[in-house]
């Protein structure tokens, strides 16, 4: 869930631990001094001062290191909240596409906040914690919008006599640890209890962990979730801001970890076929059009679903009748020429005029060829379909391909476990 760039600072209660960096109004996360010590090139991203890349490694080197080893990413700009109350599941179901009632405790799911017309307000991860709350993470670029949305809906919910309270986690940073060596590195640097937790934590599962790298706070513990935005095995650690800087520094002492910036994070997520809100997802797109029908829980697909799914009339109609979907999100792959940039028009030999548009694109470091995500008319979405992308007033051949471009390596819970 890499949030689209916004040129102004987000000034919200949930980021109260962040301080001003300079006259531009950018905000610092608790890892700011770590970034500077590692020679980061900082940019303003969604109003935050964040690293685009680090000294001694170019973007491709950073990308490949995550695919082969372990990289850490500062994602503290994202919006972290807890939903408390006896009716917390009903509250979040009333805002999203997910079936939380049937989601096992200790696990999470990707989801989308929905508008009344079925459009996507934001994408998010909802964790149904063993503790009496939901832990939710969504995008920084949408933080102000979603904060206001949650506050308004909480008031409406309370007036209806139901019990749900939104807690904005302004005192927590968020560190993503990604790559095939992530598990080993974390396991070697926790307590016996922590090792037992990690040994029984699989993809999209979440738990409190008492200690990492010798750091702990029993009154304000860290939460670790086995998930990420790269397609690799990995974790996201929600850490009290007072421990964040030392956690990053101690991870670097292992000599097995490298810090990774936003540029490589974007190429990693694109290879993994993951959406970027503001590019691949928006308020004008439904989950079905975004090829995310699987986010609509089976129970929520019933007209009698309680609560009803937001925008259900349109979404359920699209699920039942493919003719209701005029365009869909797809993956396309090309050669080694210029990159397909967002907004580039897509053409076909079969009809005159554009058939779609690129929403994200890059030269894949893993594949050595251009890949992109795009929205095209439904009749042009079959894998193997030959298309052309207009780049600098020239047409370059691309082929519709299945997503993800690079197979993911998530460690899923065995079915018999």
Segments (PLM) and residue ranges:
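Acidic, proline/glycine-enriched N-terminal capping motif
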Residues: 2, 12-114, 119-121
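Conserved, structured C-terminal
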Residues: 2-5, 14, 18-46, 50-54, ...
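Well-ordered mid-protein domain cores that form the structural environment of catalytic cofactors
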Residues: 98-153
């Amino acid at each position: 869930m890499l949030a689209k760039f916004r040129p102004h600072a987000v000034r919200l209660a949930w980021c109260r631990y962040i301080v001003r960096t300079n006259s531009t109004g950018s905000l610092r996360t608790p890892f700011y001094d770590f970034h500077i010590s590692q020679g980061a090139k900082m940019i303003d991203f969604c109003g935050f001062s964040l690293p685009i890349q680090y000294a001694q490694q170019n973007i491709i080197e950073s990308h490949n290191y995550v695919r082969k080893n372990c990289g850490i990413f500062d994602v503290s700009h994202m919006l972290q909240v807890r939903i408390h109350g006896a009716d917390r599941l009903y509250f979040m179901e009333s805002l999203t596409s997910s079936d939380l009632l049937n989601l096992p405790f200790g696990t999470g799911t990707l989801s989308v906040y929905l508008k009344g017309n079925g459009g996507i307000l934001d994408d998010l991860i909802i964790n149904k914690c063993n503790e009496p709350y939901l832990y939710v993470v969504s995008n920084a670029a949408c933080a102000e919008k979603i904060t206001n949305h949650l506050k308004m809906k909480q008031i409406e919910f309370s007036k209806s006599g139901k019990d749900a309270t939104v807690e904005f986690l302004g005192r927590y940073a968020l560190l993503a640890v990604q790559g095939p060596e992530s598990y080993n590195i974390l396991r070697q640097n926790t307590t016996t209890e922590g090792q037992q937790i990690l040994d029984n934590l699989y993809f999209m599962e979440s738990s409190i962990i008492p200690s990492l790298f010798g750091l702990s706070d029993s009154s304000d513990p860290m939460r670790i979730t086995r998930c990420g935005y790269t397609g690799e095995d990995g974790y996201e650690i929600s850490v009290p801001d007072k421990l964040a800087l030392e956690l990053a520094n101690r991870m670097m002492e292992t000599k097995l970890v490298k810090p990774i910036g936003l540029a490589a994070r974007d190429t990693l997520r694109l290879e993994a076929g993951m959406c970027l809100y503001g590019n691949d997802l928006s308020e004008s797109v439904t989950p079905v059009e975004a090829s995310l029908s699987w986010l609509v829980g089976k129970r929520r697909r019933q007209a009698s679903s309680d609560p009803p799914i937001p925008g259900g009339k349109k979404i359920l109609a699209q699920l039942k009748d493919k003719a209701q979907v005029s365009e869909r999100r797809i993956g396309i792959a090309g050669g080694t020429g210029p990159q397909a940039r967002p907004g580039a028009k897509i053409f076909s030999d079969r009809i005159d005029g554009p058939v779609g548009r690129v929403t994200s694109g890059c030269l894949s470091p893993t594949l050595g060829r251009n890949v992109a995500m795009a929205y095209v008319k439904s009749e042009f979405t079959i894998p193997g379909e030959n298309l052309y992308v207009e780049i600098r007033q020239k047409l370059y051949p691309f082929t519709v391909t299945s997503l993800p471009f690079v197979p993911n390596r998530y460690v899923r819970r065995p079915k018999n476990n």
